[in-house]
Amino acid sequence: DFTPVCTTELGRLAPEFAKRVVFIFGPDKKLKLSILYPATTGRNFDEILR
């Protein structure tokens, strides 16, 4: 939700509980990895893919 329209309408927008989510799908279009972590943690996609 890049523009917080859905999260605001559903009442799910709480900045103090902000999280980041990463989903990685394989060539077969199946979910291979799902990570949920605090927004205070930085993103390093090279490290995730490793």
UniProtKB/Swiss-Prot annotation:
Post-translational events: Irreversibly inactivated by overoxidation of Cys-6 to sulfinic acid (Cys-SO(2)H) and sulfonic acid (Cys-SO(3)H) forms upon oxidative stress. The phosphorylated form exhibits a greater lysophosphatidylcholine acyltransferase activity compared to the non-phosphorylated form.
Keyword Oxidoreductase: yes
Modified residues (Phosphothreonine): T3
Leader sequence residues: none
Catalytic residue list: C6, D28
Domain Thioredoxin: 1-50
GO cellular component, as recorded: cytoplasm; lysosome
Modified residues (N6-acetyllysine): K19
Chief site of localization: cytoplasm
Compartments it resides in: Cytoplasm; Lysosome
The entry's keywords: Acetylation, Antioxidant, Cytoplasm, Hydrolase, Lipid degradation, Lipid metabolism, Lysosome, Multifunctional enzyme, Oxidoreductase, Peroxidase, Phosphoprotein, Redox-active center, Transferase
GO molecular function: 1-acylglycerophosphocholine O-acyltransferase activity; peroxidase activity; phospholipase A2 activity
Catalytic activity: a hydroperoxide + 2 glutathione = an alcohol + glutathione disulfide + H2O; a 1,2-diacyl-sn-glycero-3-phosphocholine + H2O = a 1-acyl-sn-glycero-3-phosphocholine + a fatty acid + H(+); a 1-acyl-sn-glycero-3-phosphocholine + an acyl-CoA = a 1,2-diacyl-sn-glycero-3-phosphocholine + CoA; 1-hexadecanoyl-sn-glycero-3-phosphocholine + hexadecanoyl-CoA = 1,2-dihexadecanoyl-sn-glycero-3-phosphocholine + CoA
Matches recorded under Gene3D superfamilies: Glutaredoxin
GO BP terms in the entry: lipid catabolic process
Note: The active site is a conserved redox-active cysteine residue, the peroxidatic cysteine (C(P)), which makes the nucleophilic attack on the peroxide substrate. The peroxide oxidizes the C(P)-SH to cysteine sulfenic acid (C(P)-SOH), which then reacts with another cysteine residue, the resolving cysteine (C(R)), to form a disulfide bridge. The disulfide is subsequently reduced by an appropriate electron donor to complete the catalytic cycle. In this 1-Cys peroxiredoxin, no C(R) is present and C(P) instead forms a disulfide with a cysteine from another protein or with a small thiol molecule.
Function field: Thiol-specific peroxidase that catalyzes the reduction of hydrogen peroxide and organic hydroperoxides to water and alcohols, respectively. Can reduce H(2)O(2) and short chain organic, fatty acid, and phospholipid hydroperoxides. Also has phospholipase activity, and can therefore either reduce the oxidized sn-2 fatty acyl group of phospholipids (peroxidase activity) or hydrolyze the sn-2 ester bond of phospholipids (phospholipase activity). These activities are dependent on binding to phospholipids at acidic pH and to oxidized phospholipds at cytosolic pH.
Similarity field: Belongs to the peroxiredoxin family. Prx6 subfamily.
Subunit structure: Homodimer. Interacts with GSTP1; mediates PRDX6 glutathionylation and regeneration. Interacts with APEX1. Interacts with STH. May interact with FAM168B. May interact with HTR2A.
UniProt-recorded name of the protein: Peroxiredoxin-6
